């Protein structure tokens, strides 16, 4: 998981230009998002985890996230709740492969903020005068691999996995699709 999820999470956090006390929201707490929480915390960021599943937010809490928000189907209500309880974010990272979530992330950051999109999908329309930056990123380089290994060793990153025998690969995929796995599924031959 470090060479796929770990590198993707690391690269996305780096793209968000982390620094101490920067308010970063992570949309999509699963196989990649749970790693991003840890990388952002190592950088000293104030991290908010956003997911539609409570069980994923429980994982985020165990990993030290500062705030958790349940993503609701009403974008307007979600944004009002976040702004009222916490204020807008400095940056957001999107791992959830849903265009509406990307749109919500863009709307959840301050003027001058940044959204890092680390998934596939379309970038919704946004207003240029809000001075927001949108960056795309996926996977990383050989140097990123070295950095992830070093950071993992020095900080004891926790990779949350659920294992399945290879014969249950289809079951694992169905569980992943239905968000029934806390983070990463690993097949064992």
Question: What residue ranges belong to the model's regions?
Answer:
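A glycine-rich, Thr/Ser-enriched phosphate-binding loop motif common to dinucleotide/cofactor-binding enzymes
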Residues: 1-14, 27-35
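C-terminal hydrophobic helical "lid"/dimerization subdomain
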Residues: 103, 145-189
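Adenosine-nucleotide cofactor-binding segment
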Residues: 23-29, 39-104
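Short hydrophobic alpha-helical segments of the AMP-binding
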Residues: 13, 36, 40, 127
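Short helix-loop-beta connector
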Residues: 17-23
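Helix-to-beta-strand junctions that scaffold the AdoMet/dcAdoMet cofactor pocket
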Residues: 109-111
């Amino acid at each position: 998981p470090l060479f796929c999820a770990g590198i993707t999470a690391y690269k996305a956090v780096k793209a968000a230009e982390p620094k101490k006390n920067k308010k970063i929201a992570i949309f999509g707490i699963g196989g990649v998002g749970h790693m991003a929480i840890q990388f952002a915390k190592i950088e000293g960021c104030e991290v908010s985890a956003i997911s539609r599943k409570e069980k994923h937010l429980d994982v985020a809490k165990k990993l030290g996230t500062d705030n958790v928000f349940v993503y609701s189907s009403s974008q307007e209500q979600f944004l009002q709740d976040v702004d009222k309880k916490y204020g807008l974010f400095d940056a957001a990272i999107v791992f959830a492969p849903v265009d509406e979530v990307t749109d919500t992330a863009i709307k959840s950051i301050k003027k001058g903020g940044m959204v890092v999109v680390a998934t596939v999908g379309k970038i919704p329309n946004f207003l240029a005068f809000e001075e927001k930056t949108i960056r795309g990123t996926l996977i990383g380089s050989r140097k990123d691999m070295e950095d992830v290994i070093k950071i993992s060793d020095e900080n004891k990153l926790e990779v949350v996995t659920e294992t399945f025998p290879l014969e249950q690969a289809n079951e694992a995929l169905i569980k992943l699709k239905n968000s029934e796995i806390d983070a990463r599924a690993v097949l064992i031959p």
